[in-house]
């Protein structure tokens, strides 16, 4: 019996995929189809898939062409599979010509003609056409515009104050302007992704979320860290009981960029420390320990009293069975690490932890320690855009950051704005 194996993502299974499977099937007696897993696709920079692994497997199974379907989960698996399944022929599309010649050492490699005029990328772009404009200036907007180019079906377009010609808006203006800018976009029937905090008060936030629901629009709290694979896996590991009960979460986010701490610096157009770094630092605390803390204490060192611009701020939270703290600064420097303390071990994320691509689970016995590595492209921004586009397409809200977490973040910032803090 001649065994043939082929691999692919098979997102939105189309005629080209089916023709390739038919040609592969004709090469032998038994066809094995390897389907790339969601995580493996991310490591290869493929972030645009619209279907999950199980949906793609089901579509291939429905064709009746595959005798066996397996998941491709890591680089180098093809050699292992060829050996494990005693494969005679490796078949792949001609667009990979020469790429897999090294497999000739293990079996016969055949490059099959590719069906012209059809591709998953084109289908994804047709199915999901979202034009996004931006409100704001500076590095955040530039990064967002650059990363949007990597997302199928999403196009950035310059827009004026009327917001005409776009379906959605990215808001990265000064936090004090977020409420007005988001409200203007929602009134104009535009979906919105806004850098956190979405508003400076709970009343403003609730008004905006109510308006979005009333108009069936998507309003997303934009914290890029929430969308990275490593960060989401970190949450799962922490909540799984692997390190025991969580008793403390400590997050530090600082930067000296922008010369905020220099004498005579114009701070009027800059974000203060609590707005620039607070949402990111508070994210793992509220996602791991919840939002129902017993008390919070804010201690700050101000750069400018009239602008309420903090050079450094520390916030401590007390829960029933845990504590947490954040340190944020734009005119002070500390190690930007995240430490989650448990009764059996702890999780350590090195600086800059908010660009999470690696974390360690550590124990008293170092032989039990485990390191986790995950691909991170574009600081998580392109994953954020993909999630936003899917939310708009499916008309569902943001499940990466819950409404309760967004409110808890704003509540702390609101307390700071009211000067409910101790000054040092």
Where are each of the predicted segments found?
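Nucleotidyltransferase catalytic core that binds NTPs
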Residues: 1-130
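N-terminal Rossmann-fold NAD(P) dinucleotide-binding loop
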Residues: 17, 141, 178
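N-terminal Rossmann-like dinucleotide-binding module
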Residues: 128-164
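C-terminal helix-rich "cap/oligomerization" subdomain common to oxidoreductases
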Residues: 134, 149-150, 168-171, 218, ...
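Beta-loop-alpha module in the N-terminal Rossmann-like domain of NAD(P)-dependent dehydrogenases
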Residues: 144, 160-211
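Rossmann-fold dehydrogenase core element
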Residues: 207-224, 245-249
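Contiguous beta-strand/loop segments that form the cofactor/metal-binding neighborhood of enzyme cores
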Residues: 276-355, 386-396
């Amino acid at each position: 019996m001649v065994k043939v194996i082929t691999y692919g993502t098979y997102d939105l299974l189309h005629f080209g995929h089916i023709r390739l499977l038919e040609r592969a099937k004709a090469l032998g007696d038994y066809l094995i189809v390897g389907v790339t897993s969601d995580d493996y696709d991310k490591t290869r920079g493929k972030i645009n898939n619209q279907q999950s692994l199980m949906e793609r497997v089901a579509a291939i199974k429905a064709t009746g062409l595959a005798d066996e379907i397996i998941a491709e989960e890591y680089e180098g698996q093809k050699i292992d599979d060829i050996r494990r399944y005693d494969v005679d022929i490796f078949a792949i599309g001609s667009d990979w010509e020469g790429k897999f010649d090294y497999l000739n050492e293990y079996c016969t490699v055949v490059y099959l003609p590719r069906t012209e005029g059809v591709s998953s990328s084109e289908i994804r772009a047709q199915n999901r056409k979202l034009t996004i404009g931006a409100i704001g200036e500076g590095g955040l907007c530039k990064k967002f515009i650059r990363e949007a180019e990597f997302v199928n079906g999403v196009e950035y377009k310059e827009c004026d104050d009327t917001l005409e010609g776009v379906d959605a808006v990215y808001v990265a203006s000064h936090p004090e302007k977020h409420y007005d800018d988001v409200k203007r976009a929602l009134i104009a029937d535009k979906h919105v992704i806004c850098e956190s905090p979405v508003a400076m008060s709970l009343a403003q936030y609730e008004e905006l979320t109510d308006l979005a629901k009333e108009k069936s629009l998507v309003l997303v709290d934009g914290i890029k860290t929430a969308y990275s694979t490593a960060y989401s896996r970190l949450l799962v590991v922490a909540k799984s009981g692997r390190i025991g009960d969580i008793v403390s979460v400590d997050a530090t986010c600082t930067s000296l960029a922008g010369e905020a701490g220099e004498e005579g610096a114009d701070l009027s157009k800059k974000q203060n420390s609590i707005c620039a770094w607070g949402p990111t630092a508070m994210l793992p605390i509220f996602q791991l320990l919840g939002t129902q803390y017993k008390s919070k204490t804010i201690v700050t060192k101000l750069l400018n009293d009239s602008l309420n611009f903090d050079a450094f701020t520390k916030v401590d939270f007390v829960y029933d069975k845990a504590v947490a703290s954040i340190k944020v600064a734009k005119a002070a420097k500390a190690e930007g690490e995240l430490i989650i303390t448990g009764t059996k071990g702890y999780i350590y994320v090195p600086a800059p932890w908010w660009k999470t691509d690696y974390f360690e689970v550590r124990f008293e016995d170092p032989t039990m320690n485990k390191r986790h590595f995950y691909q991170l492209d574009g600081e998580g921004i392109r994953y954020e855009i993909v999630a936003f586009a899917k939310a708009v397409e499916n008309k569902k809200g943001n499940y990466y950051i819950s409404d309760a977490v967004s409110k808890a973040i704003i509540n702390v910032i609101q307390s700071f704005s009211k000067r409910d803090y101790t000054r040092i």
